[in-house]
């Protein structure tokens, strides 16, 4: 159990660090946009990776890596709490249209990306 917890912690540190670096990179590339582009992109990418890993792990017998990859790396990488904060911040600024768009895109595209990740992984395996 302790080894699993340490694997989750290590994965979380890796995922969170990647999320931070992507956020900084997006900010440097686009400047302050007033729209949470970095968090949106991370959540979509993370969902696609989660979908792909679920399928690959099941077919390749890698489910033992799930705590490290899914709970740790991808759990630290994607961020529902940051999503919630960004949505409320947009609402508080009075940017109701942007808030609704952000919520819709985050949910819709992340779910679609997860499904695409699963389909891509299945395509690789067959």
UniProtKB/Swiss-Prot annotation:
Q: For this UniProt entry, what is the primary localization, expressed as one broad class?
A: membrane
Free-text activity regulation comment from the record:
Na(+) is not transported, but it plays an essential structural role and its presence is essential for fluoride channel function.
Under InterPro entries, the record lists: FluC
Annotated residues for binding of Na(+): 75, 78
Spans traversing the lipid bilayer = 2-22, 37-57, 65-85, 99-119
Which compartment or compartments is the protein found in?
Cell inner membrane
Gene Ontology molecular functions: fluoride channel activity; metal ion binding
Q: Please give the organism.
A: Ruegeria sp. (strain TM1040) (Silicibacter sp.)
**Which reaction(s) are listed as its catalytic activity?**
fluoride(in) = fluoride(out)
Q: How does it sit in the membrane?
A: Multi-pass membrane protein
Biological-process GO terms, alphabetical = cellular detoxification of fluoride
Keywords, ordered alphabetically: Cell inner membrane, Cell membrane, Ion channel, Ion transport, Membrane, Metal-binding, Sodium, Transmembrane, Transmembrane helix, Transport
What's the stated role of this polypeptide?
Answer: Fluoride-specific ion channel. Important for reducing fluoride concentration in the cell, thus reducing its toxicity.
Show the Pfam families listed in the entry: CRCB
Entry similarity comment? Belongs to the fluoride channel Fluc/FEX (TC 1.A.43) family.
Name of the protein this chain belongs to: Fluoride-specific ion channel FluC
Cellular component GO terms held in the UniProt record: plasma membrane
Q: Which NCBIfam families match?
A: PRK14209.1
């Amino acid at each position: 159990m302790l080894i699993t917890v340490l694997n989750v912690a290590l994965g979380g540190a890796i995922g969170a660090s990647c999320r931070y670096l992507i956020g900084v990179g997006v900010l440097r590339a686009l400047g302050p946009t007033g729209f949470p582009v970095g968090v949106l992109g991370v959540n979509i990418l993370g969902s696609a990776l989660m979908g792909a890993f679920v399928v690959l792990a099941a077919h390749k017998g890698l489910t033992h890596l799930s705590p490290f990859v899914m709970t740790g790396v991808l759990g630290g990488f994607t961020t529902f709490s940051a999503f919630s904060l960004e949505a409320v911040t947009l609402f508080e600024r009075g940017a109701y249209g942007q808030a609704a768009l952000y919520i819709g895109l985050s949910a819709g595209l992340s779910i679609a990306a997860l499904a695409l990740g699963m389909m891509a992984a299945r395509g690789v395996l067959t």
